[in-house]
Amino acid sequence: SGVNVLAPTWYSVTDSSGKMSCYASAGLVNKMHQRGTDVWALVSDFDTNVDFAALYSSKKARTNMVNTLINDAEKYGFDGINLDCENIKSAYAKDYLQFVRELSIACERKGLVLSTDNYKPEAYNRCYNLKEQSRFVDYVIVMAYDEHYAGTDAGSVASLPFVKEAVEDTVQLVGKEHVIAGIPFYTRIWSLTPKDTDNVSQTDTSDSSNYTTSSSVYGM
């Protein structure tokens, strides 16, 4: 009953010309509207075969994406657009920001909400430039999770100190009225496997270097 926005993953960039796969559903939008829930169409950049540097540096490609999203908003009736672009590199980050600017202008003209998903602010992702983003988007969503993930030591997905720091660091760059804290609806079950399986009984259990750490994701 507390959910007021649904953001389904409906679009995924498929090539550097700005083409996107689309799974939008007017039926779902209508059903959510009947419940008083807005729908923001989520756009992802998870296809590693796409040349994102070429995509964002091309005015034509950016325009293709903007036009597709704006036209589809009218076609399917969704209320906003959420950019879940998690693979932005510093080499073309300025071009991505230009895409955000251009999309924001089109969204404002059509009365659409625009939001972006971002990592917890760190030195390595500074190129996302949250302060600049906040000048053009309605909401900056901080992904306050993945504190530990596959390949790291075992630990919490989103401990309270981690989440608190993520929000506080984001608010230093973005007005708090424009910040949404993203929380995980999943956890990880961690497993330790002895590296020396022939002498398990002699393995020093106090030394984690004797084990291989792995994890599985479980959603709620």
For the regions a language model picked out, list residue spans one by one:
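Short, acidic/polar
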Residues: 1, 57-75, 122-133
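Substrate-binding surface in catalytic domains of secreted glycosidases
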Residues: 15, 93-220
